[in-house]
Amino acid sequence: MPLITRNVFIDTEFFVKANLDFGSRTIKSFEELCEKGELHHITTTIVIKEIERKIKEHIKEALKGIKNFRRKAIVLREYEDDNIQNLFKDINDNDIEAKALEAFSNFIENSETSILDMKNVDLNEVIEMHFNEISPFSAKKPNEFRDAFTLLALRAALNEGEKIYVISDDPDHKNFCDENNDFINVDTLSSLNRHAFNRHLRVI
């Protein structure tokens, strides 16, 4: 698959399914390709806020699990083994959350991400899409306003004839890409990374 464009948008759910691990090999490879100018990461203020919210929710759930474990394993505190005692060391919830958010912020900065706001989105068009069940809206998903705003913001940012890859396995995103020639759906980021990396090798 030859690269058609450098522009790449990554759906929020991709990051969630990747466990919000911004140090993973796939995300780090993408970051490196963006730094080299092989790819151009474009996102929106909505996606930024969504991911930050997801990070906070995941941290809260993880810390809850740790506290539940400690409550059930309280008998182990009597053992003087360092490995066991480490399980009961104090955890600063705010520090953990801050570090997780910092990892995301570093990814955005290192990949030289362009962040779009909603100023160029036509609210009337969003309303029409909603009531006419035009992707990303559907009968089963009538409340996809965040996705609609994001996709229309991306469309408004493209120059005439310019295209963008959309990394998502969401059926409604795929339908939107099918209905809009400038949007190219790719199921996985690793697949796009591979083609971009191969292109980079041919160039050098």
Predicted segments with their positions:
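Active-site-proximal, substrate-binding regions of enzyme catalytic domains
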Residues: 2-162, 171-204
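Conserved nucleotidyltransferase catalytic core and NTase-mimicking acidic/glycine-rich helix/loop elements
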Residues: 166
